[in-house]
């Protein structure tokens, strides 16, 4: 056993630029935050984040912070800020190291973001993840449990909290070092790497609740809305040049087919191989005037044109030609509608990579028009699969990684009981699906039911992606896809 405060101070010195001479100063600053009573109580913890959690709990007892998770997070971030260098130092270290080894610069910043608990490693470990097979290859499924559900008391407190427009959104630069409040996340330990993309100033940070390895965000330093343009393709390819081993992609810039934040232009990236990346090409061709670019249609439930070549300027120019062609392309025979009046329905979800010295750009065609039959969107998960996924299909899911809601953890356990003919409290909206599982697997046992239900979830998610695909994976749909490609001009 060691004394809590002393142990935490020792860990700060071990993980920062502070020295032993600073120990008294650090102790006093921490006491000011958590209170003096029982600060030297015994602890058997040696992990920095676990020690931080004990100090936060002590602060609650001492009346220095409220008991709501949001209040404790604000204090926790402030305590972890002791091991986090100031932004200018973080940026200098990153770019100094980057000049010698980009890989090491990325690794160092990633490790800092985990060490200071900005990336919620413990929370992320709660996610349920598994892989299911499909005709398109393996599909990755996750049930997202990392973000804690809101406490009713916190919801009530947030309603009473003073409204604020600062920061404007959670992707703004003003989040760096922000204290946080009952209705806004703590960011005292948050750091952003400054960078240039062309003539624009951008930032690079990690996602606190990562969905995959080294999940990061690239954000415009100005609060400007999402827009897909030729500049988007240029910037994505620049990113994969600057960050070796990372992909970079953008959500679409229209509702229904876009991401959850359309108000602030940003991209996502990371060090992860998604199922779509390794999917085969159904066909290979070249576009006129672009002999240095190989193109093809990807064997994937969504409609993807893959461009590949060593000259990124050619890829940027061709991608913009495809985007503009798609923006104005309609096909009544396939229920593909570019405009309703002056309202545009067509955009793309672009993803960039660099592999073996070649640049790759996947252009995923998107259509957000609605009808009386499909009020949520013709190319949105249809009603019969919304019991599994009803939210927008964004960048990450387009690539074959399902991010399913936390409710499914309990709900799928009840489905398993139903399939086994046991007492259950299964939600009614799963019944047709669960009946189909029972009918196709009469031999199900307690040993096999979990895997059977997981595979059924995977098949349903594939259907979700097929619903979001503009050109369906049948002969008629693929012929129509080639008509669009040929309208641009192929050799």
From Swiss-Prot:
Q: Which residues form the signal peptide?
A: none
Q: Which one of the record's GO molecular function terms can you name?
A: UDP-glucose:hexose-1-phosphate uridylyltransferase activity
Record's Gene Ontology CC terms?
cytoplasm
Q: Which UniProt keywords apply?
A: Carbohydrate metabolism, Cytoplasm, Galactose metabolism, Nucleotidyltransferase, Transferase
Q: In its keyword annotation, does this UniProt entry include Cytoplasm?
A: yes
- Provide the coiled-coil residue spans: none
Q: Sorted alphabetically, which PANTHER family does this protein's record hold?
A: DUF4922 DOMAIN-CONTAINING PROTEIN (PTHR39191:SF1), GALACTOSE-1-PHOSPHATE URIDYLYLTRANSFERASE (PTHR39191)
Can you name this protein?
Galactose-1-phosphate uridylyltransferase
Query: Native species of this protein?
Result: Streptococcus mutans serotype c (strain ATCC 700610 / UA159)
């Amino acid at each position: 056993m060691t004394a809590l405060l002393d142990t935490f101070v020792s860990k700060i010195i071990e993980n920062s630029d502070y020295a032993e001479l600073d120990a008294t100063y650090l102790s006093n600053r921490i006491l000011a935050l958590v209170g003096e009573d029982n600060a030297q109580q015994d602890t058997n913890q040696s992990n920095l984040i676990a020690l931080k959690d004990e100090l936060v709990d002590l602060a609650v007892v001492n009346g220095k912070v409220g008991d709501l998770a949001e209040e404790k997070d604000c204090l926790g971030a402030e305590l972890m800020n002791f091991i986090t260098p100031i932004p200018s130092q973080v940026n200098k270290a990153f770019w100094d190291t980057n000049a010698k080894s980009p890989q090491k610069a990325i690794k160092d910043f990633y490790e800092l973001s985990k060490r200071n608990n900005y990336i919620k490693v413990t929370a992320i470990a709660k996610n349920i993840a598994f892989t299911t097979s499909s005709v398109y290859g393996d599909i990755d499924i996750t049930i997202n449990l990392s973000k804690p559900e809101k406490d009713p008391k916190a919801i009530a407190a947030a309603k009473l909290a003073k409204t604020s427009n600062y920061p404007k959104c959670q992707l703004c630069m003003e989040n760096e070092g922000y204290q946080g409040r009952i209705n806004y996340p703590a960011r005292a330990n948050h750091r952003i790497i400054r960078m240039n993309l062309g003539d624009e100033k951008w930032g690079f940070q990690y996602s606190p609740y990562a969905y995959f390895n080294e999940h990061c965000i690239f954000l415009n330093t100005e609060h400007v809305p999402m827009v897909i343009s030729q500049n988007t393709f240029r910037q994505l390819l620049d990113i994969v040049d600057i960050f070796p081993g990372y992909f970079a992609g953008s959500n679409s810039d229209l509702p229904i087919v876009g991401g959850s934040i359309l108000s602030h232009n940003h991209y996502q990236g990371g060090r992860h191989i998604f199922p779509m990346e390794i999917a085969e090409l159904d066909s290979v061709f070249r576009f006129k005037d672009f002999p240095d670019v190989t193109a093809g249609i990807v064997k994937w439930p969504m409609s993807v044109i893959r461009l590949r070549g060593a000259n990124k300027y050619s890829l940027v120019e061709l991608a913009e030609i495809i985007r503009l062609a798609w923006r104005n392309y309609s096909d009544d025979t396939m229920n593909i509608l570019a405009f309703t009046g002056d309202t545009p329905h067509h955009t793309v979800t672009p993803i960039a990579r660099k592999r073996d010295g070649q640049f790759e750009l996947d252009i995923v065609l998107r259509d957000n028009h609605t009808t009386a039959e499909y009020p949520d969107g013709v190319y949105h998960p249809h009603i019969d699969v919304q019991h599994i996924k009803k939210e927008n299909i964004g960048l990450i899911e387009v690539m074959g990684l399902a991010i399913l809601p936390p409710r499914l953890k309990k709900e799928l356990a009840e489905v398993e009981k139903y399939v086994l003919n046991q007492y259950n409290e299964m939600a009614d909206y799963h019944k047709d699906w669960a009946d189909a599982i029972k009918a196709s697997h009469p031999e199900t046992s307690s040993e096999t039911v979990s895997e059977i239900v997981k595979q059924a979830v995977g098949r349903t998610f594939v259907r979700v992606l097929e619903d979001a695909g503009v050109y369906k994976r049948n002969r008629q749909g693929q012929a129509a896809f080639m008509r669009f490609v040929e309208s641009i001009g192929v050799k």
